[in-house]
Amino acid sequence: MKNLNTYSQKLRESGLRPTKQRLKICEVLFSPERTFHFTVNDLTKIISEKLSEKISLATVYNTVHAFKKKGYLKEISINSDKSYFDTNVSEHHHFFDEDTNELIDCGIDEIDSVNIKKNITGKKIKSVEVLIKVATDNQNQN
């Protein structure tokens, strides 16, 4: 019951009505056992299986983007066509495996400091997020 109230509150704070489908989205996203990466399509599929009924892509898309805007999720853009979302909103970096399309967390202490040489007048750096894309090195395979 406590989680249901928490989920309803998150939805309301994000400007959304707590419907059965949106509450199910929250149940999957904010389960305390784990954090994970997903695309909107991935999440739609997971929710449909968990609900044993269809959920509209638009409902999932709008809910995810409302949560992102509120700071409950982080968006990681892989390219102009693909974005992943992360339920771990703490400061960290990512590896993206182009062979498996897997996004892998990388702690901020696992990358030496980034040396930023450009300064924009009147602005300060709020955060630095690094996305490192990796793929199989075919040159070293026999």
Task: Tell where the protein language model's regions lie, with residue ranges.
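Non-DNA-binding regulatory cores of transcription-related proteins
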Residues: 70-142
